[in-house]
Amino acid sequence: MFELLALNAAILIVLVLIQWAISVKINDVSFIDAFWGAGMGILAVASWLHVGGGPGDLATLIMLMTAAWGFRLGIYLFLRWRKKGEDKRYKMILKKDREAGRFAQAALTRVWLMQAVLLFMVSSPAQVGILASVAPAPITPLAWAGFGLWCVGVFFEWVGDWQLTRFKADPANHGKVLDTGLWRYTRHPNYFGDFAAWWGIWIACAAAGWGYAAATVIGPLFLSFTLTKWSGVTLLEKGLDKTKGDKYADYKRRTSAFFPMPPRN
């Protein structure tokens, strides 16, 4: 398995270097967000294609779960980048390096390679679960439980993103706070969806063996930390507090930050 994981890592590095070269050419790394999901989908498909002895049903289930989640997110974020242009987060991260003429080096070391390491780590349950599920590995009740949690996750993420896109597309909503639909029950249904989807994939990985699950639990744990404490809820709400003011403060008072809950009066 280690040789196949190394092969996945090599595939990832090649893809990252190609995209880094493109980002230097266009002077913008923002499309890396689209590769976060798509890259995980690619690694899942690559793992499935080189399962020694052929993939079992469990491997196919994990691959499809990861690919569906990853490619949908990748397309969504790529289209958003094409519409909005360079992301201000990356503009700030690379501002000094760009002014000093070190954009190419900083884009590689501070953005692309760091993201590649995190991508590989977060997607480790999918990669290992697939590679460990050699035919005729069946889909067990535990795997179906993981699939059920994944379904909850993708519902919240996909519907949440759709509702937010529709809300922002209406000029009448400028300056307003989305507090209907799934956004009535959690301030971040898309982030919660990511959380649930990847814990579902990890549970499906556990169906291949609890040893594999223990070895890869760092993936969903790190993603959970990222979504709730690092670059997800915490970072986004700092900006929303400034731009939305009292409207967002009232929304925060009424609405659960992460896990879906009935709104408070």
Go through each PLM region and give its residues.
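Short, N-terminal intrinsically disordered low-complexity segments that are rich in Pro/Gly
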Residues: E3-N8, A21-F31
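Membrane-helix interface linkers and caps
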Residues: K25, V45-T60, F78-D97
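Juxtamembrane helix-capping/reentrant segments at transmembrane boundaries
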Residues: I26-G41, G85-R110, K176-W183
